[in-house]
Amino acid sequence: MSESNELRKRQAEFTKELHGNNVTKSGFSALVSKNKSAQTEAVAKYLKHWDGKTDADAERRRLEDYNESTHSYYNVVTDFYEYGWGSSFHFSRFFKGESFSASVARHEHYLAYKAGIKENDLILDVGCGVGGPARTISRFTGCNIIGLNNNDYQIQKANYYAKRDHLDSKLSFVKGDFMKMEFDENTFDSVYAIEATCHAPTFEGVYGEIYKVLKPGGTFAVYEWVMTDKYDETNPEHRKIAYEIELGDGIPKMYSVDAARDALSKVGFEILEENDLADNDDEIPWYAPLTGEWKYVNSVADLATFFRTSRLGRAFTTSMVTVFEKLGLAPKGSVSVTNALEEAAVGLVAGGEKKLFTPMMLFVAKKPEQK
């Protein structure tokens, strides 16, 4: 058995031990149903590289362990994400009067529009999460989507939700490493990625794989997490913000916008458009749900979401998880996860306020036609 197949087998077995076969639960009900010893192991795997060190050797270890680290990260945070954010694990712009769910859907529709996705096209979703964007985009366009993910638990959930929503004839979700895609060359009409390829050890590696499986003339559209031109890695405050984002979001290294742009060009893409959608004069910033400022709430329906994601809501969640962990209802290490997510929230808001970071650097790129 190859090394990659052995890793997949081991991850699948661990996922079954940790989560069981019940994918219908979410949020706290899912958290308290975990295998306690397996959850403790999963937390340890996730946090083992996050010891406060930001030197080159620490970065190298995180980059080398990207697959296992990302798999472990989503094993421990998926339930928290669904509880706080829903099934689309990404940020979006907000317009006055627009609900949270409408904002998220519009953000996904916009990317589908930029990718030129049409009815019955075969599309690849790179880093598909639990399939929220894929379900929305398939409904919007009528396309067929294959979602690629390295986390078995999220794949199980994505396939369950697709069947629940009667979209299983249009959607499928498969296990794979986006640095070593196993699809045939020139397979997909378009490819998109939403805040996922930031988990790659290098942009060039993942973009090169996307280029390979995309048909000639096809479009790749991505919302990329990058540090902006205002970021100075030699500035301790800036590096602290980047590290908080890396720690709380399971990212081995935050790269610059230049790194993403250069990687796209180097692997052969023609960049058609680039636009930092976070660099705007919007009255409501993209990081509004994390601030705890109630002036940003647009509708009564959003009160619960904004509470869960606000500073107060996150503190409440941490307190509740602390109690659950002490009572033995939540696995040991659950509080460490909420603390890491809190660090991420602090870093994301600071990075957004100072315009050092963007979660929505839009690149639209084309694979040239064959001559």
From Swiss-Prot:
Record CDD domains: AdoMet_MTases
EC annotation from Swiss-Prot or TrEMBL: 2.1.1.41
Keyword Lipid metabolism annotated: yes
Reaction catalysis annotation: zymosterol + S-adenosyl-L-methionine = fecosterol + S-adenosyl-L-homocysteine + H(+)
InterPro entries from the UniProt entry: Erg6_SMT_methyltransf, Methyltransf_11, MeTrfase_SMT, SAM-dependent_MTases_sf, Sterol_MeTrfase_C
Keywords: Lipid biosynthesis, Lipid metabolism, Methyltransferase, S-adenosyl-L-methionine, Steroid biosynthesis, Steroid metabolism, Sterol biosynthesis, Sterol metabolism, Transferase
Molecular function via GO: sterol 24-C-methyltransferase activity
UniProt record, GO biological process: ergosterol biosynthetic process; methylation
Source superkingdom: Eukaryota
Entry GO CC: endoplasmic reticulum
Pfam families, per the entry: Methyltransf_11, Sterol_MT_C
Pathway assignment: Steroid metabolism; ergosterol biosynthesis; ergosterol from zymosterol: step 1/5
Family: Belongs to the class I-like SAM-binding methyltransferase superfamily. Erg6/SMT family.
UniProt name for this protein: Sterol 24-C-methyltransferase
Annotated organism of origin: Kluyveromyces lactis (strain ATCC 8585 / CBS 2359 / DSM 70799 / NBRC 1267 / NRRL Y-1140 / WM37)
